[in-house]
């Protein structure tokens, strides 16, 4: 093998192992995000009442806003810590999403969860997890092909 073809092979291997420098978080195969979402929802169904009512369009827009993904996660984590404790399974599972969500500076306020209202928390978290699922499926997958 010539030194030129060895060099090409080394460059190829290096490019496959180098971290992406696109400002996007890396998605790691070690954490099964769909399973985490299912665990969160299963736990919520056991400990929270079925949500009453529905989200208004403003709440849906806030939860779907990609620049608010981290800020909304923080709101859910704060509620989970205050309600279930920092070592709760829900809190630990929510924390797993921090490294894969964009850290854009929000231009709006994050979602407001009514104090001590588990139904409100559950209803908004269900919508938020659907947003994260879509983000992980489409946006990160598209970024990885760039």
From Swiss-Prot:
Gene Ontology cellular-component terms listed: extracellular space
Pfam families registered for this protein in UniProt: IL3
Predominant location: secreted
Glycan attachment sites: 65
MF terms in GO: cytokine activity; growth factor activity; interleukin-3 receptor binding
Tissue spec. comment: Activated T-cells, mast cells, natural killer cells.
Source organism, top-level taxon: Eukaryota
Keywords on record: Cytokine, Glycoprotein, Growth factor, Secreted, Signal
Record-linked InterPro entries: 4_helix_cytokine-like_core, IL-3
Signal peptide boundaries: 1-17
GO biological process, one term: positive regulation of cell population proliferation
Subcellular location: Secreted
Family: Belongs to the IL-3 family.
Function noted in UniProt: Granulocyte/macrophage colony-stimulating factors are cytokines that act in hematopoiesis by controlling the production, differentiation, and function of 2 related white cell populations of the blood, the granulocytes and the monocytes-macrophages. This CSF induces granulocytes, macrophages, mast cells, stem cells, erythroid cells, eosinophils and megakaryocytes.
Assembly behavior: Monomer.
Matches recorded under PANTHER family: INTERLEUKIN-3
Name of the protein in question: Interleukin-3
Organism: Ovis aries
Origin organism lineage: Eukaryota, Metazoa, Chordata, Craniata, Vertebrata
Gene name of the encoded protein: IL3
């Amino acid at each position: 093998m010539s030194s030129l073809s060895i060099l090409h092979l080394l460059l190829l291997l290096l490019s496959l192992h180098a971290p992406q420098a696109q400002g996007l978080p890396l998605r790691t195969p070690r954490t099964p995000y769909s399973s985490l979402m299912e665990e969160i929802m299963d736990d919520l169904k056991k400990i929270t009442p079925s949500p009453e009512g529905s989200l208004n369009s403003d709440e849906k827009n806030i939860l779907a806003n990609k620049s608010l993904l981290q800020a909304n996660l923080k709101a859910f984590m704060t509620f989970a810590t205050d309600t279930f404790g920092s070592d709760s399974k829900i809190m630990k599972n929510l924390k797993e999403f921090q490294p894969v969500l964009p850290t854009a500076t929000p231009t709006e306020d994050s979602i407001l969860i009514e104090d001590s209202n588990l139904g409100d928390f559950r209803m908004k978290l269900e919508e938020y997890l659907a947003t994260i699922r879509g983000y992980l499926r489409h946006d990160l997958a598209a970024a990885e092909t760039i």
